[in-house]
């Protein structure tokens, strides 16, 4: 088994703002767009979270929950710069670093000799160095596998860490709610609960064949996670699986004609991003996303090996038919990407060892 650390910065964007503007410290703040421009919260301070403010919430709703909330515009270039400082610290201990976003990453420290190979002490040292260099706190999860390390990093926040050793895995996952497993969202949780599955122990007792019948490939993944199995390796150079662009509209729109007016600029920007960041990848599907004024969303996708304007218009029509009279506040378009060899092969078909590791 490996020694995996998941580092997660504490309310990262908000923490950077409070560091740079001390007058914000101790106050409920959120980084996000203005409520009169239909902004959305990126992240918020712990003081704001006490009022129920959360990421991805509309700024308008956040201000209803917390009238004294201070909205701060994001400074993405600053966040990127600080993130690079943090990654430099990671690479002092291992080259096996898999960034998930600006504020979190997996590290494989199995072969790191620091602190006699203790992943627990390595994680603590990394967190201390992050604070020394950036003035920001980070939390960490330490485990032999990725998904448990990620779960563990959330168990002693803020500015803490949690360790799951190899011999603790079985007991830990037994009572673990399925909703804690990365990839199990509200919709999947409800589907699982409808068939009596709420914990990993429930899944352990459930026939794997039926799980796969109900959830497809994810059923197989879920069965493994419920047993404490995750064979994924750290990927220092993560392969991009999709490229997309979306826009939040100044006012709700309701008609197909209004939606069509939004598409050209989105498709142009998407094409630019694909050329810039996915030169060696092959398009294998197109996706349209609509978010309605009740914040529920829908996506429609179809196989395609190129960006087709006509197909985007067809997918938009199908997505709009799900609106049920609701206004549309966001429109997005994206493409799925695959290796050139994988994409070409798809198109030809119809459309617990080493338990003595120091933790």
From Swiss-Prot:
Tell me yes or no: is Lyase among this UniProt entry's keywords: no
Q: What reaction is this protein's catalytic activity?
A: DNA(n) + a 2'-deoxyribonucleoside 5'-triphosphate = DNA(n+1) + diphosphate
Q: Which CDD domains match?
A: PolY_Pol_IV_kappa
**Pfam families given in the database record:** IMS, IMS_C, IMS_HHH_1
Q: Where is the UmuC domain?
A: 4-185
Per the Swiss-Prot or TrEMBL record, the active site comprises 104
GO cellular component, as recorded: cytosol
- E.C. designation(s): 2.7.7.7
Molecular function per GO: damaged DNA binding; DNA-directed DNA polymerase activity; magnesium ion binding
Residues marked Substrate discrimination (site): 13
Q: Which Gene3D superfamilies match?
A: 3.30.70.270, 3.40.1170.60, 5' to 3' exonuclease, C-terminal subdomain (1.10.150.20), DNA polymerase, Y-family, little finger domain (3.30.1490.100)
On whether DNA damage is a keyword of this UniProt record, the answer is yes
List, separated by semicolons, the cofactors it needs: Mg(2+)
**Which keywords does UniProt give here?**
Cytoplasm, DNA damage, DNA repair, DNA replication, DNA-binding, DNA-directed DNA polymerase, Magnesium, Metal-binding, Mutator protein, Nucleotidyltransferase, Transferase
Q: How is the cofactor bound?
A: Binds 2 magnesium ions per subunit.
Specify the signal sequence span. Answer: none
Any one GO BP annotation for this protein: DNA-templated DNA replication
Q: Where in the cell is it found?
A: Cytoplasm
Cite the record's note on assembly: Monomer.
Name the protein family: Belongs to the DNA polymerase type-Y family.
Role according to the record: Poorly processive, error-prone DNA polymerase involved in untargeted mutagenesis. Copies undamaged DNA at stalled replication forks, which arise in vivo from mismatched or misaligned primer ends. These misaligned primers can be extended by PolIV. Exhibits no 3'-5' exonuclease (proofreading) activity. May be involved in translesional synthesis, in conjunction with the beta clamp from PolIII.
Protein's name in the database: DNA polymerase IV
Lineage of the source organism? Answer: Bacteria, Pseudomonadati, Pseudomonadota, Gammaproteobacteria, Alteromonadales
Which gene holds the coding sequence for this protein? dinB
